[in-house]
Amino acid sequence: MRLSKMGYFLFKIKQKFVTHNHETICEFYRRGGVKVGKNNIICDYIPIGEPGLVEIKNDCVISSEVSLITHDHSINKVTDKGSNLFGRIVIGNNCFVGQRSTILYGVELADNIIVGSGSVVVSSFSESNIIIAGNPARKIGTWNEFREKYQEKAAFRTELDDIICGSIDKLVHK
């Protein structure tokens, strides 16, 4: 079964009349064939050609405009079979996939991986507690390094007005 944009659109309309929560979005993907664990947050519609080939384990955040591509039709150009290449995508426990990232077929991510925004993940990562980013994605750091660098700058959205009005040094500068 394909997850169509129209189906998602109708789902979102229905959702406006019920209590909004991320679990209902996850349920939409479960019904479509994606294996979705518990306590996940999926922020937006994710186009998935073959939902049965995707697994998102527990406690993950999938940001908006993420693409999970489970096939590659380009093989059709170099063979006369008219076929595709297919592969599973597995996102481990407690992973964060940044906005506009793409994960290609055959990729498995270990637990506790942060995928930087805009990354293109073309190969699997079996090491846990790392940060990957880029095109193609590569390891750029560890959770501990990330925590040490940014822990003092971490804030809740409810604190943002106070930061803007007074503690501007708490904002991240690159």
What are the functions of these language-model segments?
Residues M1-G33, N135-K174:
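Terminal amphipathic alpha-helical/low-complexity segments used for targeting or macromolecular assembly
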Residues F96, I114, I131-A133:
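Short-chain dehydrogenase/reductase
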Residues H22-R31, C43-L109, S124-S126, N135-P136, ...:
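Flexible, glycine/small-residue-enriched loop-and-beta-strand segment within the central core
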Residues R100, V115-G118:
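Conserved metal-binding segment of the jelly-roll/cupin
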